Structures are given as structure tokens and as C-alpha cells.
Amino acid sequence: MHIAEVVTIAKSLPLLRLNTYKSLILSYSADYRRIFKKNILPLIDNKIGKLLLRMPIVNDKIKADMRKKAMDVFGGNFDEIIIGGAPFNADVERFLKQIGFPYTIAYGMTECGPIICSSRWETLKLASCGKATTRMEVKIDSPDPQHVAGEIICRGSNLMLGYYKNAEATSQIIDVNGWLHTGDLATMDADGYVTVRGRSKNMLLTSSGQNIYPEEIESKLNNMPYVSESLIVLQHDKLVALIYPDFDDAFAHGLQQTDIEKAMEANRNELNLLLPAYCQITKVKIHFEEFEKTAKKSIKRFMYQEAKG
């Protein structure tokens, strides 16, 4: 792809990056989920948006109008939005795909410089993070990679030589054959498209033997009304949703604490309609402070596995 002679770059540590090859490259350190929730979800939550989700074949002019509104949220003049760092809401993704919004989802690690999987928006498959990038080889460590999730392993020229002066840590992540073990679970279809399910260390195993990937449930819950962030934990073999509400939004709409509690319970009921029987959420617990985060802004899950109350 041609890149213009004059390109302006505004750089920060990205969770969402806008590539504007025409004139501008931007990267955002802000949580992209909030951007989409505040500005894109309202486009879906109306008659036209709901029609698009039900009927893929609609008037091109309607699609173009919806696409322009969505693109204007990000300034309008860009070639592609690259999303990464957290699961993407399925309804939002399907809507963006149907209106031809130029987004793609990438997967990577700092240790791989950092992209492992990515595809141009025109070819990206729904729910996937694309295919192995150039000079990278990607496999799923599973007896049936298309249907049974396994660990993503990769190797190639993008891979680091190792952690500086830490051979022990290097040997724990890169095996003797040069494969880096990411710790992420995924499936891969026959065309090589990778769909991430979650972190292996985060997977929940019920007494009935069901594997539950909490990130998949959280991505749905985080896009529901007045939810800022959430965690799904297993307590006494039952799934519990820990929710930090968007108090500013709730109070702006005149909600009191009892109203927020009712809204969270309504979210639980709606969420359960979207989930299989073995993933049903039995209880919601409200947190009044943000969850503790790592330096990479990931929630410190280990601190909340024993849900109180």
C-alpha cells in the first residue's frame, strides 16, 4: 500500500490504533471499548441498526450513511482501525462488518515485535484476529485446532532472542525448537484464521468438566448499560459476575444505588439469554472501586477469584 510522502504520527502506547495512510497515523491509549460503547452502540440500538443486524442485505445508501457516522467518531479520514488488547463485542463487530467499516483485529505480544496475527479489514473473518503475519509461523497446540482450543505457539524472525540476562525466563516461554508459548488459547480454521478464546491461566473448569473462557462472557457484559468493567469468577462451582458500574453515567441518568443494583440484575438476565446453559451467571456483585490493574492495564484477576459475600 502507498504511504503519502508527508505523514503525521501522534504516538502513545496503543490499545486501539488508527492507521491513516493518506495523511495521518494515530494511536490511542484510551480503552477502545468505551469509545465503541459510547459512540457506536447507539448506532446499533435503533431501528436501522437492529435491521442491519437481522438483514445483511439492505440498501447500500443506508449502509453508507451508517458507515459515515461511525467513521466520523474517529475523525473520518483514515484507512483502517486496528483493534487489540481485549475481546471485541460480537454484535458491534457484526454491525461494523455489515456496513463496511474499515476495522481489523490484531493479536500479538511485545516478545514478537509485536504482531503475531493480523489481516486487512477487507479479508478479516468475524471473531478472528486474522492469520499469521509475514515471517511468522503460528500453530495451535491442540489435537483438533479447528474445534478444540489449544495454546497459541509461534516462531519466526519477529521473535525476540530472549529476555535480557534472564535465560531461565526465556527457557520458560521459548522451547528448544524455537516456539514461543503465548499462554493464550485459540482455535484456527482451515484457512488459517485464528480466534482467541482467552488466557489459559484464566480458563475456568467446572465440576462437570466444562471449560469456560471468562473473557468471552465479560466482553458481552462490558457492553451492557452502566457497566464500566467486569470479572467472571467461579464460586462454589457457580459463575458470579463482579461488576464495577459506570457510576458517572448512571448518576447522570438519575439512577440511585438501588436503581443501579436493579440495572445490573437486568443485565444478568439479559446476558444469560445469550449464554449456553453451562455458562449461566447466578449472581451479580457490585464493586464500588475500580479493579486493581497491572502496568499493562489488565485486571489483576488473582485478587478477585474468591468472591466475597
Spell out what each predicted region is.
Residues 156, 161-162, 185-277, 290:
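AMP-binding/adenylate-forming catalytic core of the ANL superfamily
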Residues 244, 286-308:
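Flexible lysine-rich "adenylation lid" loop at the C-terminal edge of ANL adenylation domains
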Residues 21, 85, 138, 192, ...:
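Residue-level signal for inorganic ion chemistry
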Residues 127-132, 177:
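Short Gly/Pro-enriched turn/cap motifs at secondary-structure boundaries
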